[in-house]
Amino acid sequence: MTQAILALSQIEKAFPGVKALDKASLNVYPGRVMALMGENGAGKSTLMKVLTGIYSKDAGSIEYQGQPVSFKGPRDSQLAGISIIHQELNLIPQLTIAENIFLGREMTSPFGRILWDEMHRKADQLLARLNVKHSAKTLLGELSLGEQQMVEIAKALSFESKVIIMDEPTDALTDTETESLFNVINELREQGCGIVYISHRLKEIFEICDDITVLRDGKFIGECRVCDTNEDGLIEMMVGRKLEEQYPRIAAQQGDISLEVIGLTGSGVHDVSFTLKKGEILGVSGLMGAGRTELMKVIYGALPSERGVINLNGRTVNPVSPQDGLANGIAYISEDRKGDGLVLGLSVKENMSLCALDQLSKGVQIRHADEVIAVDDFIRLFNIKTPSREQIIGNLSGGNQQKVAIAKGLMTKPKVLILDEPTRGVDVGAKKEIYQLINQFKAEGMSIILVSSEMPEVLGMSDRILVMHEGRISGEFMASEADQEKLMACAVGRNPAHAA
C-alpha cells in the first residue's frame, strides 16, 4: 500500500481516572478514504483532538508527509493542511456564508481592504461543488441544519487541505445532500487527498471508504481494507463480541389503550388519529420533513395544537407546554439531545433529575438523598459509563449522553414514553443496550412511541408501525406484515395503505 501521508503511532492520553488512548494508531493514505470506527468512548474524538493539538499526547508519535509534527492547536494543523469537520457546527448564524467560510482569513488588498467580490466568488464556487442552492451572501441562520453542515464542509475545502477529517458528516444531511458530499469525496480522492471518515452508519462505510481502522477502549484493534471485511466482522471488531441479533424484539402482553389521538391538527400535523396500548412499541416512520417530530411535540405540548383530542388512560388532556405534558404522564426524549434534551454544562445528576424536581422535592427543598439514590439506580440500570454522578455530561460519549437523556424522561415515571431518534449518533454496542432497555420498559407495561429514520430499526423493534407523509398518516402496519418497500411507498405518498 502507498506510504501514509499521516501516521499516528502508539498514541497514549490519560485523564484523571481514565486512560482515553492506550497505544492507539491511525494511518491515512493519499487518495484513499480511511474509516475510523469504534463504539462511543472508543477514543476516536480524543485521537482527533490529539492530532489537531487540542490535547497534548502523553506518548507516541505523529508524522505528517514523512516529518514528525506536534501541532499547537486546530489553527496550526489547519494551516499545515489538515482540516477537521466537527459533528457540532462551528459557525456563526449572524454572518453570511462567505463570512463564515473565510472568517479570520478574509481576502484583502495590499492596503487591507476586504475584497468582498473575490470572497463571494470563491465561496459561490465552493457551494456549487457541494450543490448548495444559496448565494454566498445569504445569512447562515437562514439555512437548514443540513445546509449549514454543507457550509462547514465548504469551509474545510477552502483550505485546500491534504488531509480532511469528517466527523459524522451526514448526520444532519438529506439523501440528496449526502449524495453531493460523496461526489466531493470522490473528487478529493482523485486529487490525492487523504480523508478520515468517522461514522456509525455502516452502509456509508462500505459505500464510500477504502480502508477501516477500528479502536476499542482506546486501543488500536486493527486496520483492513473495506473489500476484505463485512458488517458482521466489523461489528465484532468494534464491540469485541458477536452481535447475533441486532434488534432483540420481545413478545409482551399488551394491555388496554393508554393513548388515543383523534383528528389532531397543529404545527405541521394534519388530522392525525391513532391509538397506543400498554406494553406496545409503536414505530413512527417517514422521510425528513414528514411531520414525525412535529406530531410528537404537539402531543407532548412543545408545539400548539389547533384542534383534535388526546385521551390518556381514558381522560382527555390538552398539554400546552412540556411541563404540562410531563405532568400528564408524557415524556418526550428529543432527537436533538444536545439542543433540547441535555444541558451540557451540568452534571449527570443535575441533567437526570431536571424534569423530576417536583417529585424529588418537599416544599421548596430538594430531597438530595432521594435524588442521589434515584440517579445512582439509573446509572447502574442503564450501565452509564461515567466516573461519577457529578461528571459534567458534556464529557461523556454520545451513547452515554443518550442513556442519561432517556433516564431523565423516566425519572418522571411517565405513562407514555416518546423516543425521537433514540439511537442517532450512537454506536452499535450502545444501540443494543438501548434496545434492551426499551424492551425492559415494554415488558413492564409502558407505552412507547419509537420515532426513527432508520427503517430496519422501526421494523426490528416495533409491534405496529405508522408511516407519515406531509403531516398525515399515510400507512399503518403490523410489524409482521411490513417491509422496507411498503414503508418507503407510504413515506413518499405513492401507496397509502392500512394493513393493521
From Swiss-Prot:
What PROSITE patterns does the annotation carry?
Answer: ABC_TRANSPORTER_1, ABC_TRANSPORTER_2, RBSA
Question: Sorted alphabetically, which Pfam families does this protein's record hold?
Answer: ABC_tran
Q: Which SUPFAM superfamilies match?
A: P-loop containing nucleoside triphosphate hydrolases
Q: Where are the transmembrane segments?
A: none
Q: Which reaction does it catalyse?
A: D-ribose(out) + ATP + H2O = D-ribose(in) + ADP + phosphate + H(+)
Q: What is its EC number?
A: 7.5.2.7
| Subcellular location, record wording | Cell inner membrane
Which major enzyme category is it? translocase
* InterPro entries cross-referenced by the UniProt entry: AAA+_ATPase, ABC_carbohydrate_import_ATPase, ABC_transporter-like_ATP-bd, ABC_transporter-like_CS, P-loop_NTPase
Instruction: Tell me where in this chain the ABC transporter domain is found.
Output: 6-242, 252-495
Cellular component terms, GO, for this chain's entry? plasma membrane
Q: Does the keyword Cell inner membrane apply?
A: yes
Residues where ATP binds: 38-45
List, in alphabetical order, the Gene Ontology terms for molecular function in this entry: ABC-type D-ribose transporter activity; ATP binding; ATP hydrolysis activity
Q: How does the protein's chain sit in the membrane according to the entry?
A: Peripheral membrane protein
In its keyword annotation, does this UniProt entry include Cell inner membrane? yes
UniProtKB keywords: ATP-binding, Cell inner membrane, Cell membrane, Membrane, Nucleotide-binding, Repeat, Sugar transport, Translocase, Transport
Q: Provide the family line.
A: Belongs to the ABC transporter superfamily. Ribose importer (TC 3.A.1.2.1) family.
The record's note on quaternary structure and interaction partners says: The complex is composed of an ATP-binding protein (RbsA), two transmembrane proteins (RbsC) and a solute-binding protein (RbsB).
Functional description taken from the UniProt entry: Part of the ABC transporter complex RbsABC involved in ribose import. Responsible for energy coupling to the transport system.
Instruction: Give the protein's recorded name.
Output: Ribose import ATP-binding protein RbsA
| Organism field | Vibrio cholerae serotype O1 (strain ATCC 39315 / El Tor Inaba N16961)
This chain is encoded by the gene named: rbsA
